[in-house]
A protein has these predicted regions:
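Polytopic transmembrane helical bundles with strong interfacial aromatic enrichment
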Residues: 1-187
Length: 187
């Protein structure tokens, strides 16, 4: 049930990204303060939805939910908790969710700390971030679903790639993504 909640949260985030891409941009074009003002709440709501999805994937790893293909391919019940959690972003699907969560976090940060920006500029920035989010979310939902189920579930997973079982994996991708993905705000 939790993986389905995570998948639903991704779909909800995609719908919010569509709205974030259109309404603020349209408001900036028309000079409509109400539509431009929708950018911040949409950005925060999208961040919350993606965070719920990421948390659902972490939950699947921590609880060894072997009905999720991603968990079977990248986790094992005998792994230490650190490598179960870092295994979430040690694969293609999980790293994409981390990517969009960081991007949505940057969008939410613009919403929270960009009050001094002109409203038309903030609306346009949020619209562009919404478009980027939508592209990545569509890719995840349609081609790289991390919540895909398998039945019957195997007794245990294959485990994380041994090359990725390093403390550096715990900190390297999140820090790299904060810097790498954060530059999307400047565009």
């Amino acid at each position: 049930m939790i993986p389905e909640l995570g998948h639903f949260a991704l779909i909800l985030a995609a719908m919010l990204a569509i709205t974030q891409s259109i309404l603020p941009l349209w408001g900036a074009q028309r000079g409509d303060a109400r539509l431009m003002g929708s950018a911040a709440p949409l950005a925060v709501a999208g961040f919350v939805a993606i965070t719920i999805s990421f948390a659902a994937l972490i939950w699947a790893y921590v609880t060894n939910d072997m009905t999720v293909v991603n968990v079977v391919a990248n986790s094992h019940s005998a792994k230490p908790m650190l490598f179960k959690i870092t295994g979430v972003w040690g694969n293609h699907e999980g790293s994409l969710i981390l990517w969009v969560m960081v991007l949505a976090g940057c969008s939410a940060a613009v919403a929270a700390f960009g009050a001094t920006l002109p409203s038309a500029l903030q609306a346009r920035v949020q619209a562009v971030l919404g478009m980027i989010l939508l592209g990545f979310l569509a890719f995840i939902i349609f081609t790289s679903n991390p919540f895909e189920r398998i039945w019957p579930p195997p007794p245990d997973g294959q485990g994380l790639n041994p090359l990725l079982q390093d403390i550096g994996l715990a900190i390297h991708p999140p820090l790299l993504y904060v810097g790498y993905v954060g530059y999307a705000v400047t565009f």
